[in-house]
């Protein structure tokens, strides 16, 4: 394989300003389906056509969002077209969270998080999809992880943004951080997505999502989805012990990329998840100068990381990968964990003097530790 070139990546396109924020939420060339499952109806949006035996990229959004507000800025980003031309994309909306969704009838029992995960196999069967590469954010990351634990044969890879593997996570934390005791679900959701610094500094972005959550998402249905997420079980995943082959161990078997912004309220939860996963097939990506929605605020960086991830799985090997600057932190937890990682080289950039130190990932590095990169 030709040596990958590493250069500094900077975001070059403004996002979610008054001119293009709405446009980036739009779907282009998509087909919508309502699919019946044992746990109720689910709304999906298909983008592109399946490519032979390749997996489909399947997304699942976070609470307070739908596939449009969670993922369309990312998938409409110009550089993502290099990926989407090779893969069909299936966006899944949690029940009642899609645009213009009607309210559920009185007494409706919303699916649990486990049941939401079990709605996915009938979706794949209905659409004749054999396997997926999942991209989930927050609650969606939890659902896709549960799905992968229950059906490992259907999942080739996972990109998990802001995942919390624990039974109690950010919602309790977010509510306690708000001034006073509030029952405003919009404020709770905003505190779930964004840290205090971002809430105060990125006012345009916050206002865009405040209006979206309040006006575009059915509030009764949102309360039900929020309640389901608050009632989630611990994923109960365990990190394998080096040299011990225990098939009873509960862990993600597929290639996994964990993503979190360094200013996100989810940092501790993602680090906790990383500590429980198999370091052989897990990469932790911390995105600098980024808050709670990296796929919205820094789509260029995430696109480049996703390209590396897919290349590590054997897909799109000819993709242009020259923009992502990767740095290896100096803590012991940041050592490269596997020669099979999609990131085969690491670069530490010294911003003060402009020098770069190239660091290979040969066998001399500690293979018992997860690879951690930052960009």
From Swiss-Prot:
The modification N-acetylmethionine is found at residue 1. The modification Phosphoserine is found at residues 331, 334-335, 338, 341, 352, 361, 374. One of its GO terms (cellular component) is cytoplasm. Residues 330-346 have a biased composition (Low complexity). It holds the Pfam family Ndr. Residues 326-375 are annotated as: Disordered. PANTHER family: N-MYC DOWNSTREAM REGULATED (PTHR11034). This is Protein NDRG3. It comes from Rattus norvegicus (Rat). The gene is Ndrg3.
